[in-house]
Amino acid sequence: AMVNPAAYLQQQQLISSSPLDVVNAPTYLQQQLLQQIIPALTQLAVANPAAYLQQLLPFNQLTVSNSAAYLQQRQQLLNPLVVANPLVAAFLQQQQLLPYNQFSLMNPALSWQQPIVGGAIF
């Protein structure tokens, strides 16, 4: 609010009029938080990857219990499209699974022809 009052007021107007705010408040608030921290985290990741990972640790215990889930979440934090579009998140998640698919190991061309589970994205 102090850095850019116009942007803050605009954001407050968007918050109060969002249908997601009414339907699923926790998800909406999480999305708003991510939109605010993504630029800062991205700059920190480029300037100092070690500090970036260290900064994420207090917010995320997945690094200890499940490194694969942590890396997946880290990729989503760095990609604003994932925050804005859940279909992009689903697509990226499937792309991460493709290397473990037997089709992709035997024949990469076949792996791309496999249907996407959970509905069409395109």
Swiss-Prot record:
Repeat recorded as keyword: yes
A Pfam short name: Zein
GO molecular function, one term: nutrient reservoir activity
InterPro entries: Seed_Storage_Prolamin (IPR051529), Zein (IPR002530)
Keyword Repeat: yes
Keywords linked to the UniProt accession: Repeat, Seed storage protein, Storage protein
Family assignment from sequence similarity: Belongs to the zein family.
Misc: The alpha zeins of 19 kDa and 22 kDa account for 70% of the total zein fraction. They are encoded by a large multigene family. Structurally, 22K and 19K zeins are composed of nine adjacent, topologically antiparallel helices clustered within a distorted cylinder.
Functional note: Zeins are major seed storage proteins.
Protein's UniProt name: Zein-alpha B49
Source species: Zea mays
